Design a protein with these regions (language model features):
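Primarily secretory-pathway and cell-envelope proteins
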Residues: 2-7, 23-76, 108-161
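Bacterial N-terminal signal peptides
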Residues: 8-18
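Surface-exposed ligand/attachment interfaces on beta-rich extracellular proteins
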Residues: 77-96
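A short tyrosine-centered beta-strand micro-motif
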Residues: 101-103
């Protein structure tokens, strides 16, 4: 019985400590939190799924600032782990425009992924189209015309070419 407890404690400790050794967790953007100069003018959707923010330079450096809604479609987006769902030109007030995009992973383990749904006809959406890169490698993707929903995932910087 004593051996069972020791093994159980060892396994529990390993489970708790293991994530710390794998790689650092991605820090989710927060309103007024610092962001790097490499993200200047990038937008993202906060985890509340309602607040859009843009990385802007201020007196104290770069920070995430609330974006006025509605806003013009942006050509640079940051996905930071959880899926962010945006709207394309198949909907009023699109968040991004169709065309060629490149997703660049922000670390060597990240896989950039995008799922798109387009408008087929009034009230009808296409089957979701999935594109996924390789770990640490850029993903080039064509955002479809009449794009309705687009889900961006991974710790990636998405830029319109």
């Amino acid at each position: 019985m004593k051996r069972f407890r020791l093994v159980s404690l060892a396994l529990a400790a390993a489970a708790v400590l293991a994530p710390g050794f794998a790689h650092a967790d991605v820090v989710a953007p927060q309103l007024q939190a610092p962001c790097g100069a490499d993200l200047a003018d990038a937008m993202t959707l906060l985890s509340d799924e309602r607040t859009y923010v843009t990385c802007q330079e201020g007196a104290a450096g770069y920070a995430w600032a609330a974006a006025p809604v509605p806003f013009e479609p942006n050509d640079t987006w940051l996905s930071y782990g959880p899926v962010i769902t945006l709207h394309g030109q198949g909907m009023r007030n699109p968040n991004l425009t169709s065309g060629r995009w490149t997703a660049t992973p922000r670390d060597s383990e990240t896989v950039c992924r995008v799922q798109q749904e387009t408008v087929v006809e009034a009230g009808v959406l296409s089957t979701p189209q999935l594109s996924e890169g390789e770990p640490g490698q850029p993903l080039e993707v064509a955002m479809a015309p009449k794009l309705f929903y687009v889900e961006l995932a991974g710790n990636c910087l998405w830029e319109r070419d």
